A protein has these predicted regions:
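An acidic, low-aromatic, low-complexity terminal/linker signal
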Residues: 1-157
Length: 157
């Protein structure tokens, strides 16, 4: 593997599906804490939280992708990311691992499960920590910018 094509991704689950985002977007992983609700926002925007003096939107990622809302449980957490100079938090079911992938192994993704093209940037097979079978897990790479969360918040204001 040539290291100049390698990048790190944070993998996480939403229901039975495994997703990944580029590690360079991640600011921190926070335990779930119910956000303060906002009026007149799309239902996938769960509210806002205060992150060391900065108010950030908390997005139900499953809802934003058009699926059933995530059920809150002990491993639920929020991925705080930087998108276009703004911060946002995404509720996920569980963080699985941080893995290095070879960019050349990323396969194009068919837009069959998500109504918006471009949200799934690709698919990659990865070996996740704790996977006893030794088989790789298919991970859908999300393009968080394509979700246009910051634009939706500005429109709701």
């Amino acid at each position: 593997m040539r290291h100049n094509h390698e990048r790190k991704i944070v993998t996480f689950s939403l229901g039975s599906r495994m997703f990944g985002i580029d590690m360079s977007l991640l600011i921190e992983i926070r335990e779930w804490e119910a956000p303060t609700p906002l009026p007149r926002v799309p239902s996938h925007i769960l509210g806002v939280s205060n992150l060391r003096g900065t108010v950030i939107p908390i997005v139900g990622l499953a809802e934003r992708l058009g699926w059933e809302p995530s059920r809150i449980h002990a491993r639920s957490c929020v991925l705080v990311v930087s998108l276009g100079g703004q911060q946002a938090g995404f509720l996920v079911d569980e963080v699985a691992d941080i893995v290095a992938i070879d960019a050349e192994q990323v396969q194009p993704a068919p837009d069959v499960e998500i109504a918006e093209p471009g949200v799934i940037a690709g698919l990659v097979q990865v070996a996740l920590r704790g996977n006893q079978s030794g088989a790789g897990t298919m991970v859908s790479l999300l393009d968080l910018e394509a979700l246009n969360i910051t634009g939706q918040l500005e429109a709701a204001a």
